[in-house]
C-alpha cells in the first residue's frame, strides 16, 4: 500500500501532491489495477491533512480514470501507468543511484539534485541539448 507524504512548504497543493504520488506509484508499477488506496481516515492520520483534501485528490484520480470509489468498500486503482519495459531498466536505476550519490558527495541537497535533474531533462527533451 502507498504511504503518502505531504510537504506543506513545497508550494504544491497538498491534494496535488497526493495525486502526483499515486501517479508516480502507478508509473513505477508500485500500484496496480485493483489495488485499494488507503482510506481517507488512514491518510488523514498518516499525514495530518484535512479529510476534504484527501477526498479532492481521490476525486481527481477518478476524473483522470485512474481510480474509482466503491461505496462502503473504498477507492481502487482502475488502470496502470506503468511502462511495461520499466522493470527491465535495473541497470539504469543503478546508474541513477550512483549519480545521486555523486551529487550528494558534491554537496548538493535533495532539492538541488531534483532541480539539476529536471533542468537537464527539460533541456534534453525541449531544446534537444543537455
What are these language model-derived features?
Residues 36-37, 69-77, 81:
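Short, Lys/Arg-rich nucleic-acid/phosphate-binding segment
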Residues 22, 58-59:
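Short, hydrophobic-biased segments on the C-terminal half of alpha helices
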Residues 36-47:
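A short alpha-helical element within helix-turn-helix/winged-helix DNA-binding domains
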Residues 45, 62-63:
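Alpha-helical residues within the helix-turn-helix
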Residues 1-36, 90-94, 100-130:
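Extreme N-terminal segment that seeds HTH/winged-HTH DNA-binding domains in transcriptional regulators
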Amino acid at each position: 500500500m502507498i504511504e503518502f507524504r505531504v510537504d506543506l512548504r513545497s508550494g504544491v497543493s497538498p491534494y496535488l501532491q497526493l495525486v502526483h504520488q499515486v501517479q508516480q506509484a502507478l508509473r513505477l508499477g508500485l500500484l496496480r489495477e485493483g489495488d485499494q488506496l488507503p482510506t481517507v481516515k488512514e491518510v488523514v492520520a498518516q499525514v495530518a491533512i484535512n479529510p476534504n483534501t484527501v477526498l479532492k485528490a481521490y476525486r481527481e484520480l477518478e476524473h483522470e480514470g485512474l481510480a474509482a470509489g466503491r461505496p462502503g468498500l473504498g477507492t481502487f486503482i482502475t488502470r496502470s501507468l506503468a511502462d511495461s519495459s520499466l522493470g527491465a531498466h535495473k541497470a539504469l536505476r543503478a546508474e541513477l543511484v550512483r549519480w545521486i550519490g555523486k551529487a550528494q558527495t558534491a554537496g548538493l541537497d535533495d532539492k538541488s539534485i531534483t532541480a539539476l535533474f529536471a533542468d537537464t531533462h527539460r533541456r534534453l527533451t525541449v531544446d534537444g541539448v543537455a
